[in-house]
Each structure stands twice: as C-alpha cells, then as structure tokens.
Amino acid sequence: AAAKCDDVLNFLPARLTGGLIALASIGAGGGVAAAIKTMLADAPKHASPNAGWPEAAMAGGLGIWLAGPRTYGNRRVIADRFNASGRDARIGDIAAGLRVVQKAQIILAALLLIAGWPAIYPIAVQFGQLFG
C-alpha cells in the first residue's frame, strides 16, 4: 500500500522533474531535444512508474546511456538502457549531470517566483512601506 501511495503522490513531480532536467540540458552533451525524446521514449521502460522520467531525461540530455543490465549485490537485473544509442558515461559526466541538476533547480525557482509574484508583490509593498 505504501509503494502504491508513493507512486500516486510522485506521479506529477517525477514528470515535472524530467521536464526540468530536459530544459536544463541546454549546452549539455545531448541537449534539450534529445533529453525530451529520450524521456518520452524510454521513461516507461523503467520498473518504477516514476523513476524513469528524470533518469531518461538525464541520459538524453547528457548524450549517454544509463540503466541497462546491472548487478545489485548478488542479484542480476536485466533492464533496457535509456538512450541506448548514447555513448558510455565518463567521469566528466558526473559534473555535467550536477550542472544540469543545478540549472533545473534555478529554472524551478524562477518559475515559482514568477508564478508566485502576484501573491508576493502586495506583501513586499507593505513590507517596504513598514520598513522603507
């Protein structure tokens, strides 16, 4: 029951995060279009209904493949690769991925500020009158 609740509650945030990562992939190895294409094509391949969206967007955005067959402890997991035509990841892709995440956070903050400005502005004006 807890896992289903998690799936429901994270349905929109996972897709929003994937979209933000895709937008933030400008200038990264794969770019925005590849991030969106990979996200839409490969995210549903993930065993989780939500985890694949940001992971696939990052794979496309960086131009690398992620996921695929792997081993967890003694258990072998057989899974499709995200962005299967992408190159192998290199050490520099960790820093590039972190930059993409940072840009995604800035985009989200800007969107929240813009969306919230009509509500914030009157408070800011009153604050300025009180302390200005």
Task: Go through the PLM ranges and name each one.
Residues 1-132:
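Hydrophobic alpha-helical transmembrane segments
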